[in-house]
UniProtKB/Swiss-Prot annotation:
One of its GO terms (molecular function) is catalytic activity. PANTHER family: HISTIDINE TRIAD HIT PROTEIN. Gene3D superfamilies: HIT-like (3.30.428.10). It holds the Pfam family DcpS_C. Residues 5-107 form the HIT domain. It comes from Neisseria gonorrhoeae. This is Protein HitA. InterPro entries: Histidine_triad_CS (IPR019808), Histidine_triad_HIT (IPR001310), HIT-like (IPR011146), HIT-like_sf (IPR036265). A motif (Histidine triad motif) lies at residues 97-101. SUPFAM superfamilies: HIT-like (SSF54197).
Length: 107
């Protein structure tokens, strides 16, 4: 997507403090954190929200969910963490590219 800031981060057109990346997803620090540690995990492929996910996204979404605890632990969130997916304007979503918030206080 041409105007999607998260697509631009995934394509390395905009810098971000990346903490994890593979061929399908990238995780970076939120520039406006709501917790001492606030990360965003995004798929490199664009779809607006969880409500826009298609059956072919199921393997990717599963991989992302399983990657969350690994990223949290590697980032120092060893005493627990919170995950959040805002979906749609009414659900508080501000950037319309699916993303998983990973938040907590590093130990």
């Amino acid at each position: 997507m041409d105007n999607c800031i998260f697509c631009k981060i995934a394509a390395k057109e905009i810098p971000a403090q990346t903490v994890y990346e593979d061929g399908e997803m990238v995780c970076f620090k939120d520039i406006n954190p709501a917790a001492p540690l606030h990360l965003l995990l995004i798929p490199k492929v664009h779809f607006d929200s969880l409500a826009h996910a298609a059956p072919e996204h199921q393997p990717l979404l599963g991989k992302m969910m399983l990657k969350v605890p690994e990223i949290a632990k590697a980032s120092g969130l060893t005493d627990g963490f919170k995950t959040l997916i805002n979906t749609g304007k009414g659900g508080g979503q501000e950037v319309f590219h699916l993303h998983i918030h990973i938040m907590g206080t590093p130990v």
